[in-house]
UniProtKB/Swiss-Prot annotation:
It comes from Clostridium perfringens (strain 13 / Type A). The chain crosses the membrane at residues 88-110, 262-284, 312-334. The keyword Zinc applies. SMART domains: PDZ. The lineage of its organism: Bacteria, Bacillati, Bacillota, Clostridia, Eubacteriales. It is found in: Cell membrane. This is Putative zinc metalloprotease CPE1693. One of its GO terms (molecular function) is metalloendopeptidase activity.
Length: 335
């Protein structure tokens, strides 16, 4: 049952993403031939007006098929007949909608359940924090030069330091202090300094909106940091990288933990989906935007057949990567 909730939640993220492409395409007068949720063989579909809406067998992915997207067309309503700016807006709309969804969820969670802020509520006796003079009410501003917007930013900073001392910028009253602390591992294998955070139990609307923006911004930053560790080889592919199987398992666990946890995980996945899709890789939205930018710079249209060839190769590589990561999930499961 929880897996069903998880799949429905993930499908909702895809729906929102593709809806972004669909809405902006329609607003720009583009003929949308097909709106699909999922990949692979079609389960069922219905045609409303000029567009066919269908659901496909694999619950990962989706697409909006627009006239002129895969080949050249002389029709004034085709994608290739529109300006580069219009095409970029269409391609970027999916990721934008995922950001908006994450923001709305985080604001809702902050307003309904409260949140922890970057202020110290208490200091554990004989902890690293006490040793360097951290006091109740201190507010963390930076860790190793990186701004702290949420408590997750602080935890990420400790994790990235890998046990090495970190430099903290702290606000105490009207003063800004700089202190260096040596993190220690707790029983869960996570680095800590021995503090608890102050809780905002009944935030105002302004506080909730601010926290929503901070949470979204923090996740975007963490996503790029994670990508960097994968590219540079710092990440352990066995334990730090998960694919479809891991996502389903984690979604199921989130659903089992309750509505708030599932909503938070949905927002988390929504940000990951947005960041991933904006990477400048062929077949992804970011790759298509990159091509449009190149065409704007050289002031010349690249023949559609070449663009389609590049996107086809990119899609095949992505599918191959998904298969490999799925196999990895089965052989070396994270959960």
């Amino acid at each position: 049952m929880y897996i069903i909730f998880a799949l429905l939640a993930f499908s909702a993220l895809i729906l929102v993403h593709e809806l972004g492409h669909f809405i902006v395409a329609k607003l720009n007068g583009i003929y949308v031939e097909e709106f699909a949720i999922g990949m692979g063989p079609k389960l069922f579909g219905v045609k409303v007006g000029e567009t066919e809406y269908n659901l496909r067998i694999l619950p990962f992915g989706g697409f909006v098929k627009m006239l002129g997207e895969e080949d050249e067309s002389d029709d004034s309503r085709s994608l290739n007949a529109k300006t580069p700016i219009q095409r970029i807006l269409v391609m970027g709309a999916g990721a934008f909608m995922n950001y908006v969804l994450a923001l709305i969820i985080f604001i809702g969670l902050a307003m309904s359940s409260g949140f922890a802020e970057n202020k110290v509520a208490s200091v554990v006796p004989n902890s690293p924090a006490q040793e360097i003079g951290i006091e109740q009410g201190d507010e963390f501003l930076k860790i190793d030069g990186n701004k702290i917007h949420t408590t997750d930013d602080f935890r990420m900073g400790l994790a990235l330091a890998k046990g090495n001392p970190v430099e903290l910028e702290i606000k105490r009253g009207n003063d800004v202090l700089t202190k260096t602390v040596q993190p220690i591992l707790n029983e869960s294998g996570m680095y800590q300094v021995g503090i608890s955070y102050a809780l905002v139990e009944k935030p105002t609307l302004l506080q909730g909106i601010k926290q929503g923006f901070n949470e979204t911004r923090s996740l975007v930053s963490q996503s790029f940091i994670a990508l960097k560790t994968i590219v540079t080889g710092e990440a352990n592919l066995k334990t730090d990288v998960g694919g479809p199987v891991t996502i389903i398992k984690m979604s199921g666990q989130a659903a089992k933990a309750g509505a708030n946890t599932l909503l938070w995980f949905m927002a988390f996945l929504s940000v990951q989906l947005a960041v991933f899709n904006l990477l400048p890789f062929p077949a992804l939205d970011g790759g298509r935007i990159f091509i449009e930018l190149i065409q704007m710079i050289i002031r010349k249209e690249i023949p559609a057949k070449y663009i389609e060839a590049v996107n086809t190769v990119g899609f095949m590589l992505l599918m191959g990567l998904m298969v490999l990561v799925t196999i990895k999930d089965i052989i070396f499961p994270i959960l």
